[in-house]
């Protein structure tokens, strides 16, 4: 089963990706992981990517797509894969389709976890962690016994810069601008599965599993 997984920050995408990996026995593949693996392995494309990244540049689509093609040709992808964070643009989606078509494959389903923006803001902006031991909390769902103080070591709690409300809203805006055209693209190809991302982890897993057998 060849899958793509979309989801805004804070939607629980990592948890659901792991569910797909364990349920269907297919690897989760992210662009970042692929680039790092290619660089570490010293492949020709990995060497090119490393040179660009060292100079602070953006790795071109040609290199990224080459690395994607190499990764999808590996033995562990024989039964399928879960692409996470790729494609990011319509040209990348078109190129991915060509890569797969060349080996007689296609994207079977695109899973899009749908969570209201305000819910995401509440989830992420409420997160706190201990400045000393790193234990995580949430002001609403998992608060400390004493406000602002770690239950374990008594140190102060801090909020990550990424979890500040303004930052979260900006990340959501970027996500929507980036994925809205892709969702339309895959909807027109009748492979988009929009999954409500509100509920327990198990409930969301059940929705995904049901969508994949339709």
Swiss-Prot record:
Instruction: Report the catalytic activity.
Output: AMP + ATP = 2 ADP
Family matches, as InterPro entries: Adenyl_kin_sub (IPR006259), Adenylat/UMP-CMP_kin (IPR000850), Adenylat_kinase_CS (IPR033690), Adenylate_kinase_lid-dom (IPR007862), P-loop_NTPase (IPR027417)
> Which terms does the UniProt entry file under GO BP?
AMP salvage
Name a single GO cellular component.
cytoplasm
Superkingdom of this protein's organism: Bacteria
> What pathway is it annotated to?
Purine metabolism; AMP biosynthesis via salvage pathway; AMP from ADP: step 1/1
UniProt GO molecular function: adenylate kinase activity; ATP binding; zinc ion binding
Q: Which SUPFAM superfamilies match?
A: P-loop containing nucleoside triphosphate hydrolases
- Can you say where in the cell this protein is located? Cytoplasm
- What residues bind ATP, as annotated? 10-15, 127, 199
- Known EC number(s)? 2.7.4.3
Please give the NCBIfam families that the UniProt record associates with this protein: adk (TIGR01351), PRK00279.1-1 (NF001379), PRK00279.1-2 (NF001380), PRK00279.1-3 (NF001381), PRK14527.1 (NF011100)
- Oligomeric and partner information: Monomer.
Which protein is depicted?
Answer: Adenylate kinase
What organism does the UniProt record list as the source?
A: Trichlorobacter lovleyi (strain ATCC BAA-1151 / DSM 17278 / SZ)
